[in-house]
């Protein structure tokens, strides 16, 4: 797919369309083959777009949606009470084939509910899972679920593992190492759901399941795909982001204490900048909703301009790789024994 069209929910997130429009236009400039559809209050979006010079309007559409979903709104209200919300209209563009992916920084619960309703799940998948890249010592790993499913059955964890493995392959990992996040690596550790999921994964053909991994093993890069329920995954993700921000702030403070530390800091500045870039939450912003019949990427509600750009770029990669269809083909093979 040479010219993907990405539908952007311009009204979602903590900051409304300001950051979203700026990030979208930056991506449009950086990627000549990209086409975008900005969905939301058309007059406001047009005003923000007009403030930027040299915008290629031939690759940009503004689509009006009369409603927006609040960050604290109940998913049921968003689903039933707002048929013309920017989030829903963006998803419907994907469902109708007018766009290849949707990116939203809006209400996570509403996005999950609307995505399942509008796009439907792939055969063999009960619920989508949120997945994102987590930095490790050797690069990064794919972690799922990140909050879409707080409580998960063993079968759901199994499905997540298969989907995560396929995504890792698409991103260039030849034989992804798949692990379950647990409180220990011994077989006796973990709750019943995790133990049952381990049994399903051990019996699966075509999956490189390596067993359990603990939290520190995740950061050492012991696995390429790490699977857990959404409660654990969300806590881990936000703790990781908070830790990265805290470390960067502490290092900056240490190097500002006195003249000597400032001199040392100046010498180490290139390395520190590289470390800060590698660990910056904005660089890893964008969690995919795997298991849908369409590409959907969830951005942090508080994402910066660069952070939202990362989410758009993730959607571009997944749409170009035709992720849903590749997932569908692999799932048919993995689930042919009827285990779903």
Swiss-Prot record:
UniProt entry keywords in alphabetical sequence: Cytoplasm, Lipid biosynthesis, Lipid metabolism, Phospholipid biosynthesis, Phospholipid metabolism, Transferase
Protein transport keyword on record: no
Reaction(s) the record says it catalyses: a fatty acyl-[ACP] + phosphate = an acyl phosphate + holo-[ACP]
Example of a GO biological process term: phospholipid biosynthetic process
Keyword Lipid biosynthesis: yes
Protein name: Phosphate acyltransferase
E.C. designation(s): 2.3.1.274
Pfam families: FA_synthesis
TM regions (residue ranges): none
Subcellular location: Cytoplasm
The organism of origin for this protein: Pseudomonas syringae pv. syringae (strain B728a)
Source taxonomy: Bacteria, Pseudomonadati, Pseudomonadota, Gammaproteobacteria, Pseudomonadales
Pathway: Lipid metabolism; phospholipid metabolism
GO CC field: cytoplasm
The organism's place on the tree of life at top rank: Bacteria
Main location: cytoplasm
Alphabetical list of Gene3D superfamilies matching this protein: Isopropylmalate Dehydrogenase
Function text: Catalyzes the reversible formation of acyl-phosphate (acyl-PO(4)) from acyl-[acyl-carrier-protein] (acyl-ACP). This enzyme utilizes acyl-ACP as fatty acyl donor, but not acyl-CoA.
Oligomer status and interactors: Homodimer. Probably interacts with PlsY.
Family recorded in the similarity comment: Belongs to the PlsX family.
Record-linked InterPro entries: FA_synthesis, Phospholipid_synth_PlsX-like
MF GO annotations: phosphate:acyl-[acyl carrier protein] acyltransferase activity
NCBIfam families from the UniProt entry: plsX
